[in-house]
């Protein structure tokens, strides 16, 4: 069994998968806007799930942005500004007291689709995650 955690701008979602990849548990909570509260929330989720399943579980965390190989700091996480320039993976490892694997959320999405999703029968899989918004500012419809 293993824990997967998806950290986003507004939520933290956790899932526990069994050895065959079947979902055993799924939970969602609001994402705090404070960096240390997020680390604490992930620790609480981890401990709660380990207690529920009565064993230590490996954990992987996906989030916007990437870890700089030179510094270990997160960069390019515009929707999760609280992650910018923070040693997220190292802080999680220290707080949880075990190995924590962190990866960019788009990379995790593409890997999941390639391994057991819609791309599992293909040699090459291209994953796209787009957060987008269209703004109409001149003249504003609200000004009408």
Where do the PLM segments sit?
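Short, ordered coil/turn segments that flank beta-strands lining enzyme active or ligand-binding pockets
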Residues: 19, 70, 142
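Short glycine-rich anion-binding loops that position phosphate/pyrophosphate groups of nucleotides
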Residues: 64-67, 131-133
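Short glycine-aspartate micro-motif
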Residues: 2-6, 58-60, 125-129
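Glycine-rich phosphate-binding loop and adjoining helix at the ATP-binding site
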Residues: 32, 39-43, 47, 57-59, ...
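Conserved beta-strand and immediately adjacent loop positions that scaffold enzyme active sites
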Residues: 1, 13, 63, 126, ...
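Short glycine-rich, Thr/Ser-proximal phosphate-binding strand/loop in the N-terminal lobe
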Residues: 2-40, 74
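Single conserved hydrophobic/aromatic residue that forms the stacking wall/gate
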Residues: 136, 141-144
